UniProtKB/Swiss-Prot annotation:
One of its GO terms (molecular function) is actin filament binding. It is found in: Cytoplasm, Cytoskeleton; Cell projection, Podosome. Induces disassembly of actin filaments in conjunction with ADF/cofilin family proteins. Enhances cofilin-mediated actin severing. Involved in cytokinesis. Involved in chemotactic cell migration by restricting lamellipodial membrane protrusions. Involved in myocardium sarcomere organization. Required for cardiomyocyte growth and maintenance. Involved in megakaryocyte maturation and platelet shedding. This is WD repeat-containing protein 1. SUPFAM superfamilies: Nitrous oxide reductase, N-terminal domain, WD40 repeat-like. Gene3D superfamilies: YVTN repeat-like/Quinoprotein amine dehydrogenase (2.130.10.10). The lineage of its organism: Eukaryota, Metazoa, Chordata, Craniata, Vertebrata. Keywords: Acetylation, Actin-binding, Cell junction, Cell projection, Cytoplasm, Cytoskeleton, Phosphoprotein, Repeat, WD repeat. GO terms for biological process: actin filament depolymerization; locomotion; sarcomere organization. The modification Phosphotyrosine is found at residue 238.
Amino acid sequence: MPYEIKKVFASLPQVERGVSKIVGGDPKGNSFLYTNGKCVILRNIDNPAIADIYTEHAHQVVVAKYAPSGFYIASGDVSGKLRIWDTTQKEHLLKYEYQPFAGKIKDIAWTEDSKRIAVVGEGREKFGAVFLWDSGSSVGEITGHNKVINSVDIKQSRPYRLVTGSDDNCAAFFEGPPFKFKFTISDHGRFVNCVRFSPDGNRFATASADGQIFIYDGKTGEKVCALGGSKAHDGGIYAISWSPDSTHLLSASGDKTSKIWDVNVNSVVNTFTMGSNVLDQQLGCLWQKDHLLSISLSGYINYLDKNNPSKPLRVIKGHSKSIQCLTVHKNGGKSYIYSGSHDGHINYWDSETGENDSFAGKGHTNQVSRMTVDEHGQLVSCSMDDTVRYTNLTLRDYSGQGVVKLDVQPKCLAVGPGGYTVVVCIGQIVLLKDQRKCFSIDNPGYEPEVVAVHPGGETVAVGGADGNVRLYSILGTTLKDEGKLLEAKGPVTDLAFSHDGAFLAVCDASKVVTVFSVADGYSENNVFYGHHAKIVCLAWSPDNEHFASGGMDMMVYVWTLSDPETRVKIQDAHRLHHVSSLAWLDEHTLVTTSHDASVKEWTIAY
């Protein structure tokens, strides 16, 4: 019973206000890479739906850069670990690992022969190191700064030069190898966020939080000019990137614009205004072949259009925070995946192409905990902002209507025919009919965690933290406790009725899935063991013969109802991140989401 990965819809870059985001390009110009959490994400620049995720860092990764040869990538994390790994194979084998200093690595630069690496950041005893890639032997010292170094670059032609930019408002110029400190450049009045040599090595540029960009001679370090005369931008500048022919420079700023500069005549060629919201601040940029990319504070990746500066060619959206829940729905013959994340953001994806967007208008303001689609084709979602929302899936617009405010925080919801929604909250079970609250059980006597409604619409199953499942009946506008207890093997974490209503599957914190037979008075049908840690989600296949479970052990199992031994085990479905939610597109296609903020589609063969 094999499986294979069909599609990966990758996460967006992880961004932080006021901190520049480094986006690296590959030397051949086909792909770009960035980091999110413990992952390094590699994406095809022409078709960003093609993605690969590297997850071998134990800590949050800050920066990753291709070697000029294109065969290796160096990535550095917050603990000061630098990993150099292979790009040619799917396994991304580790070549070398170094710890140049103890503390966050903020930038990496290679020499053009891919033999030496400079690493800078916030170490305890030093802020940078430069060494041979294969032995780790030092090839110089990075000195001259008394605060954290934000950026480093090396001239890509001999004689080598190295330049750094720091929070002490200075840039420093080095000659080598071995690299020795030559002089400090103190033209900026605020933090220096980014320093970059032009591809031909003739010049380098420094960009700072003071809104200025200075151009210098690449060989001597002499100042050539200040772009734009005095100020290049009205806000701090977080990133710069040279054009491949070394004549133009792209800059990204907190004033919510990106600009293209003609360096030879010192003038602005284009100004891209990205919006007026604080989330439109520009924190990163990349110029690769004909593509101009910028990164917004929202995490969105913008493909800029030189011919129409007011509107990007395309904007890549998705999630930059961990995904908590998902659901799938067919609309107009297409299958869509809906995913909700920790920051209240809901995204929808075309399951075939990976084309995606977020809903229009103002939606949830906190973590989306559970989503499902009701009989009217509305997305029903509950969130830690204490609301349940009904969103029309043809309009995909959060309007003022369709919001139900609850007294306490909801954890899970389920919908049934006849306009019913059952919501379990902290210490409360609420029944909604036609988007109105009609009944609640205020002190159920246990802590309800999850809920499912039988496809027939009369029975509601509620799983509790006490390890029991209780059954309720929907009678008009009330819920009646049937007084029946089904015992799970531990605190219930998720439950679901099969689509034909014949079985109820219950998973728990004790790593077990128990299936009850509905027709036989909810007698225990089978028990499924295999997970190594708490199971958090499960979903039935449309064939009602198989169901999938995902857990904190990063594993997904696809079980066969009749035989617990016949199973598909997807190891490391989302490596280093537990699986947060599952759904089936069809009998052989499973969708998984995780705290790594990515969505994956798997083909399952029985």
